[in-house]
Amino acid sequence: SAMGIIMAATWILTLPDRIRAINSKNMNTVKSVILDISGGGIRFSLSTPLEEGTYFMAQFSLALEECTQQFNIVCKVIKCTQSLDYADRYFARSKFIFDRITEREKIVRFVFEEERRIRRREME
């Protein structure tokens, strides 16, 4: 089931040096929806195909312990496939390239809390 987290913007990085690319001005913004998230990466849908190995900046927010936190994390595309149902829809899997381990811990905590909430709802 879709988590419904909207990735506000995804900047596609074209340079091999990802740090310089993140700061460069020639970045396209791609609207996409995160379908699944884990401590290791995200699966999302978008309207433009991404090449495997592409680095991009994922910008999204998660509700963590009563407050919403913004994340800006560099990701690397692992796989991108076209939807069987819609010609203009693609599904991509990417792994996080973390600068700080605390970001990963916060995402893992979000996933854990979300699973606990779902289990609680199923038991009601």
Functional labels for PLM-detected ranges:
Residues S1-E124:
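Structured alpha-helical
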